[in-house]
Amino acid sequence: MTIDNHPLKKHAEKLQTLVTSAEFTDEQGESLSYSEGFENTLKLLKKSRAQKACVFLIGNGGSAAIVSHIFNDFINVGKLRAFTLHESSLVTCISNDYGYENVYSKPLKTLAQPNDLLIAVSSSGKSQNIRNAVNSMKEVGGKVITLSGFDNDNPLREMGGGNFWLNSRDYGLVEVGHMFFLHFLSDHLKP
């Protein structure tokens, strides 16, 4: 089998098509060009760094693994005050006492300040705990960036000041696309 027709190459081509056809929208749901979407997101991160604001990153499952990884790069490369909220004892405490749907919103109500930024990652965009966290961040006056996929009408896709959406129901492709976008942002945060 040559590389030209190998399944790995075809899968990589699917990823390329998916990422290059990503859709960006603003808080009014207005479509943004690829350049505008990326630049607006990068500006929010640079503004957070300049203001010494916190950048909180959340996700479930594979999305939690993605934000754990990018958290390192945001601190090491981007010099951001970045934090994840899925430390195991905190997750079990909040889930037990307040329900898993509040696992991120409850800590954000305590920790987040106006001008802080939340990056919410959910492949389906339907996770209640992620959407509750977005609402909590908005309540304290913070900014929100969402990364989602799957259905065009997923609720998370319309909740952020900036929204990055991938038109696929393939978890693996959506997750890798989210990681690609976040890595690209991190690479452009170098001071």
Range-by-range predicted roles:
Residues 1-191:
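Conserved N-terminal alpha-helical segment that immediately precedes and caps sugar-phosphate-binding
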